[in-house]
UniProtKB/Swiss-Prot annotation:
<dbReference type="GO" id="GO:0005737">
    <property type="term" value="C:cytoplasm"/>
</dbReference>
<dbReference type="InterPro" id="IPR011033">
    <property type="entry name" value="PRC_barrel-like_sf"/>
</dbReference>
<keyword id="KW-0143">Chaperone</keyword>
<dbReference type="InterPro" id="IPR011961">
    <property type="entry name" value="RimM"/>
</dbReference>
<dbReference type="GO" id="GO:0005840">
    <property type="term" value="C:ribosome"/>
</dbReference>
<keyword id="KW-0963">Cytoplasm</keyword>
<keyword id="KW-0690">Ribosome biogenesis</keyword>
<protein>
    <recommendedName>
        <fullName>Ribosome maturation factor RimM</fullName>
    </recommendedName>
</protein>
<comment type="function">
    <text>An accessory protein needed during the final step in the assembly of 30S ribosomal subunit, possibly for assembly of the head region. Essential for efficient processing of 16S rRNA. May be needed both before and after RbfA during the maturation of 16S rRNA. It has affinity for free ribosomal 30S subunits but not for 70S ribosomes.</text>
</comment>
<dbReference type="InterPro" id="IPR002676">
    <property type="entry name" value="RimM_N"/>
</dbReference>
<feature type="domain" description="PRC barrel">
    <location>
        <begin position="102"/>
        <end position="179"/>
    </location>
</feature>
<comment type="subunit">
    <text>Binds ribosomal protein uS19.</text>
</comment>
<keyword id="KW-0698">rRNA processing</keyword>
<comment type="similarity">
    <text>Belongs to the RimM family.</text>
</comment>
<dbReference type="Pfam" id="PF01782">
    <property type="entry name" value="RimM"/>
</dbReference>
<dbReference type="Pfam" id="PF24986">
    <property type="entry name" value="PRC_RimM"/>
</dbReference>
<dbReference type="InterPro" id="IPR056792">
    <property type="entry name" value="PRC_RimM"/>
</dbReference>
Length: 179
């Protein structure tokens, strides 16, 4: 395991180690990528806990098992040593992400955008997104200058999202402020 991880500002969380698997140092990983197996495309991970960068590890192998991945990391051969990694977030530098088509965004790109309704009212800023199964949901929290102090859950759908202006840091939405 290497102790020279990338800058914390450049890292994006793509998964989390949540337990051990077997006795040979494998770990169970919950992947935030879609599809789940895309996490295995990144061979070097930065592990962190509670927001602080901790260490870099190298992926040896991984396999899909039900709704999680079972992963073997270089130099990790003991169940008890593997148990110490439970709870660590798996991060990779954002520059390793593939380019997207026009009009497509990674969640981290949407976080922090101001959300403005069709009447020009500031509803708040996107704090984070949730995967619900049917569609993604934006958690919009109040900010300075927002209409009120309400937290809103807005669907990330074509019907709701009218326009995204990354340069201005804004998203226009079709949404009733009273809802």
């Amino acid at each position: 395991m290497n102790a020279t991880p990338a800058s914390a500002d450049d890292l994006i969380v793509i998964g989390k180690i949540y337990s051990v698997h077997g006795v040979r140092g494998e770990v169970k990983v919950y992947s935030f990528t879609d599809p789940i197996g895309n996490l295995l495309d990144y061979k070097t991970w930065t592990l962190r806990r509670e927001g602080s960068v901790e260490k870099q590890v190298e992926l040896v192998s991984g396999r899909l098992q039900s709704k999680f991945l079972v992963v073997k990391l270089k130099g990790l051969d003991d169940r008890e040593e593997a148990r110490l990694l439970s709870g660590y977030e798996i991060c990779v530098p954002r520059n390793l992400f593939p380019d997207l088509d026009d009009g497509e965004y990674y969640w981290y790109q949407l976080e922090g955008l101001k959300v403005i309704d069709q009447l020009g009212q500031l509803l708040g800023k996107i704090d984070h997104l949730l995967e619900t199964g049917s569609n993604d949901v934006m958690v919009v929290k109040p900010c300075a200058g927002s209409l009120d102090d309400r937290e809103r859950l807005l669907p990330y759908t074509e019907q709701c999202v009218l326009a995204i202006d990354m340069a201005a840091g804004e998203m226009k939405v079709e949404w009733d402020a009273d809802f």
